[in-house]
Every structure is written in structure tokens, then in C-alpha cells.
């Protein structure tokens, strides 16, 4: 056995025996070389192997720390099966790791905290963002990346600022992201809806809208649409981009669930764009936690200066502490490690949901995608409000779809499903209860 392997095993055993706690700093390389009577390069080899195994992580100019590997079970405080909540499971996040990054961020950026930042965001985070975005097949220059206070802020700025095509009307899928629907209604923005279903959108209708209306941009979720859970195929993406280029319409791509993609061959719309007509939005609210309030926006060159000006008048800069902590979290490799682990957890839940739908609700239409969001298309004779109320009384929580539509748009009979906050063993039980309720004539008109 080589010397570095002996050191690796020693430290690994101490971590597994909890002699070294999650978040605890390892002795310095110099101290370890003295402890094990070996060269610093031997210690570095052992530490690199521990890092490769995701047992420790490095923070520049600080040292090596033990990764928090705990994924505690959620306390069973309720008997409800919650298909309504879309926020991530709070107990799954390794708080100790991120808390350490927060503390380190305050130490590292003491002076910067007393100055206003830049409209684009913390430069060191933007550099990490550029490298991270490349793993999603988003290749761009750092000058076109903005750190925003969540995707919601990016959407607000894009909705209010003028575009180079000098148009005003926004096109949105129906149904769509409920908070953006609220924003459009509140500000009374000119808007048109296009129906999206399990089968996607009608491309002929899309062309007709692009051709006959002054469409500023088309807001879309090509991957794992909220609330439907559906995704566009490659041919649909290419067709949408072709029409956008022909009619000079920008595409706002909300890729909020990119981190949960299990198929490495699926790329975002942005990666197919050759005419600089796609604005890419990346969120951390699902993969980490909504309270972080950090998102990335990638702008085409023509829109970059104006977006920067509008963002500066909105908040000058997003939270410096959150930005600095996220930079360290990404740079240390902890984000990639956590992303791989938690996306696998949600994929397992989504697979159980898909199997349960096929087993108990096969007579209804639902998407085939393995996603934490899904839905069931119900017959028109189903009274959706009565059905939801009935299921709530039987401890199955569901949310009406009304908020995902614009005013005046005929709502589909769609039952939204989200498994973000349901334990695996409860998913099929919940679907069975829905199937039983649909067999009850009291839930029909």
C-alpha cells in the first residue's frame, strides 16, 4: 500500500466514525505532513482522493472541510399527502456546508459588504456561473451573464424594458408559471396565451401569432414545464427557434429544473440558437432553497446594455452575502455533489409517481416524462373544485390550477401533481386515493 493510501484510509475512517464532524476543518497540509511524517505532495494526493470521493471539500485560502453527508428523514408531523407544495424538501439540504460558506463569505468579502456591488453581480460568482452554465450546454461570455434576485426579478425586468424589436406584447403558454401570471395581471401588461398540452403546442398557431401580433417575446419552459411536467422534443425546439428568427421574436427560456434532468442528451433551447434570440434563465430555488434569491440570466448582446440599466435602477445588486456564499459553494464542488445526490432522490420519487399513474389512472391522459411535476387530464364532467375539496378531507392536498392561467382563458380540467414534499412510500397511496375519488359520482357535475 502506498503512503497516500494509508493517509486516505486513516482520514476516511475518522470521518465515518464521526471523529471528524461535518463542516469541521482538517488540519493544515503542513500539520498533516508532520503528523504522518511524509511530504506535502503525498498529503495532497490523499486529500485529492478524499475530495474525489466527496468526503471533503476545499475552500481557497482557507483549507479542507468535511462534507455533510447526512440526508435526514423528514419528521412525520402530518398524515397528509401533499401534492400541492412545490418548494423543495427543507430537510434534504446540507445546511452545515452552506452555513460554512456563508461564514467564509463574510470573512472573505468584509470590505465589499460595505460597498454597492455591480449591476451584473459579483464578478467572481459570474466567473463560476459561466463555468457552471457550460455544464448545461450554455456557452456565453461573462459580460452577458447577470446575477438576479431570483428568476422572478429577471422576468420583471424583461417584461418592463423595451426590446430591440420595438414590440410590446408578451406571449405565454397556458397554463404557465403562476407567479409570472400574477405579475402580468398586476401590471396589466399586453399578453396573449397559447395552449400547451401533453402534446406540446400547435406550431401553426404559434406562427400565426408571431405573424399577426406584435410579439416582444415568448416566455416558455421547454424542459419540465410548470405545472404540466412536459418537455419539448428537439424538433419542436428547432421549429420554435426557426419561427422566432423569421419573425424577430425573442424567446425567454425558463430552465428552472435543469438540475433534475436525467438524460444527458437533452439540451436547452439556448444551445440550438444561432440568431441570438434566446434569453436563458437559471434558478436555484428548486435545487437548493427559495430563500437564497439568486438566479442567472444570460442575455443576447443587443439586450445586454439595456437590461443592465434596468437592473441597476431596480436594486443595484443582488444580496452580496448570498452571492459570495453561492460562489464558494459552487467553487468548492459541494454544489455538484449535492446536485447529483438530490436530483437522484427526486428522480426516484418521480419514477414511483409515473408507475402509480400507469397502475391506477391509466384511463386518463398524463405525461410520460419522469418529473417532480405532473398532471392528469380529467373529463369535462368532473367538478374539479369538489374533487379537490373531497380529497383534502381525505388528507390528500391538491391545488387548483386557476392561478396558472391568464384571466379570461378557459381553464382545462387539469389536476396538478407535485411530489417535492412527499415521502416515496406515500406517493402510490395518494394516487390510489385520487383514483377512488374519481370513481365517486359525487365529484361530478
Locate predicted features.
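N-terminal basic, amphipathic alpha-helical segments
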Residues: 1-105, 111-117, 125, 130-131, ...
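Residue-level marker for buried hydrophobic side chains located in beta-strands
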Residues: 83, 251-252
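Conserved core of the PLP fold type I
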Residues: 112-247, 259-260, 265-272, 346, ...
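Short, conserved active-site loop motifs that form the nucleotide-linked donor/cofactor pocket
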Residues: 145, 249, 278, 363, ...
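Hydrophobic residues in beta-strands of the RecA-like P-loop NTPase core, especially within AAA+ ATPase
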Residues: 172, 252-253
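PLP-dependent aminotransferase class I/II
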Residues: 279-359, 364-366
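Short, solvent-exposed loop/turn elements at beta->coil junctions and helix N-caps
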Residues: 284, 402-406
Amino acid at each position: 500500500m502506498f503512503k497516500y493510501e494509508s493517509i486516505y484510509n486513516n482520514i476516511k475512517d475518522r470521518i465515518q466514525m464521526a471523529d471528524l464532524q461535518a463542516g469541521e476543518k482538517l488540519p493544515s497540509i503542513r500539520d498533516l505532513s508532520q503528523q504522518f511524517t511524509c511530504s506535502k505532495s503525498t498529503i495532497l494526493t490523499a486529500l485529492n482522493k478524499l475530495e474525489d470521493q466527496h468526503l471533503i471539500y476545499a475552500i481557497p485560502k482557507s483549507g479542507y472541510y468535511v462534507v455533510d453527508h447526512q440526508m435526514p428523514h423528514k419528521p412525520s408531523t402530518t398524515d397528509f399527502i401533499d401534492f400541492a407544495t412545490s418548494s423543495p424538501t427543507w430537510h434534504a439540504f446540507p445546511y452545515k456546508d452552506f452555513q460554512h460558506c456563508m461564514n467564509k463569505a463574510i470573512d472573505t468579502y468584509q470590505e465589499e459588504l460595505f460597498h454597492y456591488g455591480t449591476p451584473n453581480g459579483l464578478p467572481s460568482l459570474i466567473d463560476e456561473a459561466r463555468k457552471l452554465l457550460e455544464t448545461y450546454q450554455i456557452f456565453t461570455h461573462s459580460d452577458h451573464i447577470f446575477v438576479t434576485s431570483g428568476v422572478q426579478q429577471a422576468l420583471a425586468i424583461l417584461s418592463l424594458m423595451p426590446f430591440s424589436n420595438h414590440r410590446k406584447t408578451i406571449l405565454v403558454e397556458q397554463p404557465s408559471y403562476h407567479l409570472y401570471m400574477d405579475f402580468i395581471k398586476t401590471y396589466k401588461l399586453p399578453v396573449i396565451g397559447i395552449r400547451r398540452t401533453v402534446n406540446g403546442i400547435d406550431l401553426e398557431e404559434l406562427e400565426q401569432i408571431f405573424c399577426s401580433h406584435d410579439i416582444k417575446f415568448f416566455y416558455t419552459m421547454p424542459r419540465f414545464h410548470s405545472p404540466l411536467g412536459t418537455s419539448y422534443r428537439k424538433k419542436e425546439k428547432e421549429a420554435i427557434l426557426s419561427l422566432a428568427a423569421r419573425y424577430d421574436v425573442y424567446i425567454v427560456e425558463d430552465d428552472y429544473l435543469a438540475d433534475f434532468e436525467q438524460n444527458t442528451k437533452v439540451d436547452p433551447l439556448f444551445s440550438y440558437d444561432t440568431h441570438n434570440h434566446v434569453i436563458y434563465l437559471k434558478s436555484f430555488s428548486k435545487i437548493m432553497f427559495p430563500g437564497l434569491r439568486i438566479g442567472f440570466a444570460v442575455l443576447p448582446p443587443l439586450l445586454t446594455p439595456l437590461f443592465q440599466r434596468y437592473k441597476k435602477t431596480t436594486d443595484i445588486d443582488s444580496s452580496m452575502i448570498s452571492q459570495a456564499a453561492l460562489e464558494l459553494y459552487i467553487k468548492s464542488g459541494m454544489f455538484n455533489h449535492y446536485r447529483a445526490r438530490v436530483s437522484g432522490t427526486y428522480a426516484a420519487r418521480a419514477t414511483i409517481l409515473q408507475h402509480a399513474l400507469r397502475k391506477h389512472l391509466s384511463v386518463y391522459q398524463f405525461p410520460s416524462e419522469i418529473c417532480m411535476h405532473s398532471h392528469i387530464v380529467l373529463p369535462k364532467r368532473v367538478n374539479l373544485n369538489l374533487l379537490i375539496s373531497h380529497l383534502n378531507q381525505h388528507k390528500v392536498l391538491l391545488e387548483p390550477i386557476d392561478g396558472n392561467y391568464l384571466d379570461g382563458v378557459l381553464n382545462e380540467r387539469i389536476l396538478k401533481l407535485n411530489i417535492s414534499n412527499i415521502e416515496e412510500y406515500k406517493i402510490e397511496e395518494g394516487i390510489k386515493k385520487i383514483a377512488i375519488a374519481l370513481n365517486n359520482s359525487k365529484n361530478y357535475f
